[in-house]
Amino acid sequence: MEKEIEIIVPFYDLDPMHVVWHGNYVKYMERGRCALLADCSMTYENMEKHGYAFPVVTMRVKYVKPAMFGQKIIVRTVHVPDENFLIFKYEILDAATRSKLCVAETKQMAIDIKTHESCFQLPEPFLTTFGGTK
């Protein structure tokens, strides 16, 4: 599964050096991930209805080139099949040239909302939707 979304960098995402503040790339990745999850009817609201939360447990980010105010960017989100975690890879690209601005990966673990216990394998229906071989 993969999804691409477009974002035009707003002024309020810039830092004092006039480039996108590094933490806002995480926000862009979240928007991409939510769009991909919505495509497979697994929004965070649906996850909660099934009794699970999926906090991010690891995140790796590599900043390649800064995004600028008004720049049209693409957030490409790719799901990596796994039986234990929700794993997503991201590329943030310049929309005009497709040059890489940022690459990243997140890993999310299922947590039972009632007991707050970690699940070391994806529970159903998440295993059917997101599991599989790497």
Locate predicted features.
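Hot-dog-fold acyl-thioester-processing enzymes
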Residues: M1-V56, I111-K134
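HotDog/MaoC-like acyl-thioester-processing domains
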Residues: K3-I5, M68-F69, V80-K134
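Hydrophobic beta-strand-centered segment that forms part of the acyl-chain substrate-binding groove
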Residues: L36-I87
